Curated annotation (Swiss-Prot):
It comes from Lactiplantibacillus plantarum (strain ATCC BAA-793 / NCIMB 8826 / WCFS1) (Lactobacillus plantarum). It is found in: Cytoplasm. Contains large globular domains required for ATP hydrolysis at each terminus and a third globular domain forming a flexible SMC hinge near the middle of the molecule. These domains are separated by coiled-coil structures. The lineage of its organism: Bacteria, Bacillati, Bacillota, Bacilli, Lactobacillales. This is Chromosome partition protein Smc. Residues 519-637 form the SMC hinge domain.
Length: 1185
């Protein structure tokens, strides 16, 4: 395949339609700077799919459209068409000629065509992928690309070999696979989160459903036997009721007779008991006074014994502390003396150290190298001066010889010599001006390059920092998004349970699901109470099933809803009509006393909130329940028997008013209605906060990306400006070098001509010149003699100084050893002093403490002495009072004994009458109770059949168990016990479990499919990595071999190698370059000179083209950094290489131009508009031959 032509219209400076036909061989494109040569290369890159605006030296894509000039208006479209000869079907299309067209309109629209057929940019990219002709391939080699090769890090340089290996397609496939893997993993994580949440629901629901089914089975059996029990009880009760009614009439008459006799005896007995009660009251008061006085006497005597024992203990402690104080004061005196001795010793040792340090410093100065260096420097100066005088001696000798020679020559060339000198001086002045101008330009450009390079480095560092921050922000966003998704899944599951009222009884659930039909229904208690987190469990336990009570406005509303449940056979529910419910509260005094008990947090009704209209409901439910922190405190309150209320702890234990204790734990304590509601609220709040954080992360991420994008544009602009500055600097340096070379030649010419003129004019003063020369030679000889004497003196001083220094060094070593010993003694003394000071301070503190304790004991003893006298007085007074009270009590007991005898006799008579009356009354009441009981049993059984089972007695008798009533009752007890053990069940859990299980199984299957897909993607990535590594290694070996061969050709010898920085990891290993140009050592590319690096980099690019030939290659001033000799080698290699590759070269170098077959010149005859002219150098070469 060959590049056949390029047609440009409206692209950058090519305003007019321009067509460039390319021939086989080497095509050169030349022209002055700014004429538009590089626009041709950019047009080729653009039409082949380049999308990076900065690579096209623009800020936006529409910058490639001709923007107008002084004489032309801007165009609205840029169009580039590139045509290939595809007769060898290099491109995978069935066309002998392939043309690719790209159009861009100023409104931003784009068109892409292949052989005039509309296509996508992706189609063009895919057509060129791995052909070596893509927008980023090595078919286009610029000076910047050459610099990138030798400036790149080894890890960046590996992309060159990857391009040769043709692994772009595989890496693109891997990138696509990685994206799919990330999506699959993300989706799998979300599915697993939902599965985990469903699994958490599934376990409790399965248990609830199982319990519900068991409950239904046992409930059916229970209802059947209960109906049979009611029918049998009703039949028996009717038969017994008839006999009881007859006995009841006889018993009533007998009760009236005995009651009259009892009433008369009761009046007399009441009078005696009144007297007895008064006497008993007086006795009790006297006994209480006597006991109180005895208690006072005993307490006072006991306290006297305790006080005596305390005084003895205090006196013993006082003696012990006094002895300890004396010992401590002795220790303080000893340690104070020791401290003084140590301070004196330390002062003496520090003085010795100071003296020895002064001696060491003095000897150190004496033995320093400064003196030796001063003598060496002086000797070196004398030698340099001696050598300078020797050079002067040689010059004087030459001058003398020249004087003789020039004196012998005479000439008539003075006039011609003067003209030549004037012309040379004029030329020198002109070149000097040019050199000054170029010097200034070079300094300015170097400063600009340095500043621009610093700016670029700073911008690149900021881009890297921003990229790291973007990665960190991206990771934080992903972590937050994943966490939020998991929380949302939990919230959705909880909301689904709440919306379906899954955890409510069937009847309650039916009412809540149809509440819109009943305007008076406020909701379930669990929905209407607001409970602080710390009390949730306590309130939930305290209310239990009452949380599912339904609050409504009136009894009529409750009746309407009850009828609704009956009609739909939807279960039962308990209703709390606001108009009828009365608040229940503890008495004010009881509530006040209860609040002061340890551990009491408050009455439950006052710790929760609700609407004001529901206050009575709240207090009805919780007004007599107190919340306590721990079970121990609750048990203590219950034992006091002062508070008749229900106690509930924070952990859910309860103590009833009767004293019954309930507690423990179940596996699903956190599934309560209130706890689920609070969990949903907390999760919703967390999700809202996470969403806010995500928005913040997204905004921060967008800001970072925008800032980095802007900064990247700035970096590219700076890099482009830097490249342009370097180009200008290279040109200026070349111009300066040429001017300096010319300046040097002209300076030499002026000096030579001036000297000739001076010699010609000096013939008249030949004798004077010879005399001066002889005088100068004599002075020179004297100076040489003087320098020789001074050098001998300095050398002797050096010898003496070495001997003196050796002696002083020995002394210095001895003094340093002594200093070290003294310093160690000082440290040891300081440690002893610090230890002594610490011990002394500790003893002082001990002394203060002992003194404080002694003072406290003395105060206590004085106080106790005063208390002894007071207690003696109290004891005497109490004993006297107790004797008087005891005498009064004995008198009262004698009077009470007489009354007791009278009461006893009359009571015996009254008891006998009462027994007779009571027996008659008991018979009557027993019969009456039997009547009431039997009537109640009949009514209750009839009502139960109607209310529970909606049956009449006749209908119930149609289906009765054949078991006897005791057997039925026993079985009912067993069934009731089973139902109680099951407890409250959620009948809706059966359907909910089936729904959750179905979704759980479905998602499990999905998770298995996703896991299998993930493993397949991982295997695909591993296969792609293997393919990339294999192709990379093969391409590397081939390029390395060609590189070594071509290096010898390009450098005319030497050797070079490509090496892998990490051969064990082919997927990440960098590529380093080692080179040894002729006459140099084997070293890294970065250590070579600039020209050697450039030529080595070009050699590597040629090696790449040799391994993977491309139909054509475009070189954009790739050889700009080479000298003339290397440019010739470069051009010659292109001639040898072009048999298989077509080359298009943009160049300024004459050596390159000479080897081109066709030259295109780019000019700007009209400002801002590029034109093309061409000439066939091959034809010219043939004509010249």
């Amino acid at each position: 395949m060959q590049l056949k032509s390029l047609e440009i219209s409206g692209f950058k400076s090519f305003a007019d339609k321009t067509k460039i036909d390319f021939q086989a061989g080497m095509t050169g494109i030349v022209g002055p700077n700014g004429s538009g040569k590089s626009n041709i290369i950019e047009a080729i890159r653009w039409v082949l799919g380049e999308q990076a605006v900065k690579s096209l030296r623009g800020t936006k894509m529409t910058d490639v459209i001709f923007a107008g000039s002084a004489n032309r208006k801007p165009l609205n479209m840029a169009k580039v068409t590139i045509t290939f000869d595809n007769s060898d079907h290099f491109l995978p299309l069935d066309y002998a000629e392939v043309s690719i067209t790209r159009k861009l309109f100023r409104n931003g629209d784009s068109d892409y065509l292949i052989n005039n057929q509309s296509c996508r940019l992706k189609d063009i990219t895919n057509l060129m992928i791995d052909t070596g002709l893509g927008k980023d391939s090595f078919s286009v080699i610029s000076q910047g690309r050459v610099e990138a090769v030798f400036n790149a890090k080894p890890e960046e340089r590996r992309s060159i070999i990857e391009d040769v290996a043709g692994v772009l397609k595989y890496k693109k496939d891997k990138f696509t696979t990685e994206n799919k893997l990330a999506e699959t993993t993300d989706y799998l994580d979300r599915v697993n989160d939902i599965i985990a949440e469903l699994n958490q629901q599934k376990g409790p629901l399965e248990e609830q459903a199982s319990l519900a089914r068991d409950y239904q089975d046992q409930k059916q059996k229970f209802d059947y036997l209960d109906r049979s029990r009611l029918v049998k009880k009703l039949t028996i009760a009717r038969d017994q009721l008839q006999g009881v009614n007859e006995k009841l009439a006889s018993a009533k008459a007998l009760v009236a007779k005995y009651q009259q006799q009892v009433d008369a005896g009761a009046t007399k007995l009441a009078n005696l008991k009144t007297q007895q009660t008064a006497q008993l009251k007086q006795k009790d008061e006297l006994v209480a006074q006597n006991l109180e006085l005895i208690k006072t006497i005993e307490n006072t005597q006991g306290q006297q014994g305790v006080d005596a024992e305390r005084r003895q203990n205090q006196q013993s402690e006082q003696e012990r502390l006094t002895a300890s104080l004396t010992a401590t004061e002795q220790q303080i005196a000893t340690q104070t003396e020791q401290q003084t001795q140590l301070e004196q010793t330390l002062s003496e040792q520090q003085a010795q150290v100071k003296a020895v340090k002064a001696q060491v410093a003095e000897l150190t100065t004496a033995t320093s190298a400064a003196g030796r260096q001063q003598l060496a420097d002086e000797l070196e100066k004398l030698r340099n001066a001696y050598i300078d005088e020797k050079q002067v001696q040689a010059e004087l000798n030459n001058e003398a010889k020249n004087l003789v020679k020039q004196h012998q020559q005479s000439g008539s060339q003075s006039t011609a010599l003067a003209e030549r000198l004037a012309q040379a001086q004029a030329n020198l002045k002109r070149v000097q001006t040019t050199v000054d101008v170029h010097n200034r330009e070079q300094r300015d450009l170097e400063n600009q390059v340095s500043q621009q390079q610093a700016t670029l480095t700073a911008q690149q560092a900021q881009v890297k920092t921003n990229a790291e921050r973007i990665d960190e922000q991206q990771q934080r966003w992903l972590d937050a998004a994943g966490l939020m998704q998991r929380e949302k899944s939990r919230l959705e599951a909880l909301q689904a349970v709440q919306e379906r009222y899954t955890n409510f009884y069937a009847g309650v659930r039916m009412v809540l699901q149809h509440r819109q039909q009943f305007s008076g229904v406020a909701g379930a208690v669990s929905e209407l109470l607001t409970v602080p987190d710390q009390y949730t469990k306590a309130v939930e336990v305290a209310l239990g099933g009452q949380l599912q009570n339904i609050v409504c406005d009136t009894q009529q509303t409750a009746k309407t809803v009850v009828n609704f449940l009956k009609q739909n056979h939807a279960g039962r529910a308990t209703f709390l009509p606001i108009e009828r419910i009365t608040a229940r509260q503890l008495p004010v005094n009881t509530e006040r006393d209860l609040s002061q008990q340890p551990g009491v947090l408050g009455v439950a009704s006052e710790l929760v909130d609700c609407e004001s209209r529901l206050t009575a409901i709240k207090r009805y439910l919780l007004g007599t329940t107190a919340i306590v922190d721990t079970l121990d405190h609750a048990m203590a309150i219950s034992r006091s028997r002062r508070f008749r209320c229900k106690l509930v702890t924070i952990d859910g234990e309860t103590i009833a008013a009767s004293g019954a204790i309930t507690g423990g734990a179940t596996r699903h304590d956190d599934n309560g209605l209130l706890q689920q509601q609070q969990s949903a609220e907390k999760i919703a709040a967390n999700v809202a906060q996470m969403q806010s954080e995500l928005v913040t992360y997204e905004q921060g991420l967008a800001d970072l990306k925008k800032a980095n994008q802007d900064l990247t544009v700035q970096v590219e602009t700076t890099r482009q400006q830097l490249s342009e500055l370097k180009d200008r600097l290279s040109q200026t340096q070349a111009q300066l070098q040429a001017a300096q070379s010319e300046q040097t030649q002209l300076s030499r010419q002026v000096k030579a001509l001036t000297y000739e003129q001076q010699q010609t004019q000096a013939d008249d003063s030949y004798e004077d010149l010879v005399a001066r020369n002889q005088q100068a030679q004599a002075a020179n000889a004297a100076k040489l003699k003087d320098y020789q004497d001074q050098m001998k003196t300095v050398q002797q001083q050096q010898t003496d100084y070495e001997s003196y220094q050796q002696t002083q060094t020995t002394k210095l070593q001895a003094q340093r050893e002594q200093l070290i010993t003294l310093q160690e003694h000082v440290k040891q003394t300081q440690r002893q002093l610090e230890q002594c000071q610490a011990t002394l301070a500790q003893n002082e503190e001990t002394k203060k403490q002992i003194q404080a304790d002694l003072t406290a004991i003395k105060t206590t003893l004085a106080s106790q002495q005063m208390s002894v006298a007071e207690r003696d007085t109290v004891l005497k007074t109490a004993k006297a009072k107790q004797a008087a009270v005891e005498e009064q009590r004995k008198t009262c007991e004698q009077q009470l004994a007489t009354l007791n005898d009278q009461v006893e006799e009359l009571s015996t008579q009254q008891v006998r009458l009462q027994q007779l009356a009571a027996a008659a009354t008991d018979d009557y009441r027993r019969l009456e109770l039997s009547q009431t009981k039997l009537t109640g049993e009949v009514d209750h059984a009839t009502a139960d059949l109607a209310e529970k089972y909606q049956l009449t007695v006749a209908a119930a008798q149609a289906d009765v168990s054949g078991l006897a009533l005791p057997a039925i009752t026993e079985q009912l007890k067993l069934l009731k016990r089973g139902l109680d053990e099951i407890g409250t069940v959620n009948l809706g859990a059966i359907d909910e479990f089936e729904r959750v299980k179905e979704r759980f199984d479905f998602l499990n299957n999905q998770a298995s499919d996703l896991t299998e897909a993930k493993e397949h993607l991982l295997q695909t990535m591993a296969d792609l990595d293997t393919t990339v590594a294999t192709r990379f290694k093969t391409a590397f070996d081939q390029v390395a071999s060609e590189f070594s061969t071509i290096f010898e050709q390009m450098f005319g010898g030497g050797k070079a190698e490509l090496i892998l920085t990490d051969p064990e990891h082919l997927l990440t290993s960098g590529v380093d370059i080692m080179a040894q140009p002729p006459g140099k050592k084997f070293q890294r590319l970065s250590l070579l000179s600039g020209g050697e690096r450039a030529l080595t980099a070009i050699t590597l690019l040629f090696a790449i083209l040799a391994v993977r030939p491309v139909p054509f290659s475009i070189l954009d001033e790739a050889e700009a950094a080479l000298d003339d000799a290397n440019v010739d080698r470069f051009s010659q290699y292109l001639n040898d290489f072009q048999t298989g590759t077509q080359f298009v070269i943009i160049t300024h170098r004459k050596g390159t131009m000479m080897h081109a077959d066709v030259l295109y010149g780019v000019t700007m005859e009209e400002s801002g508009v590029s034109k093309m002219v061409s000439v066939s150098l091959a034809d010219l070469k043939d004509e010249q031959k």
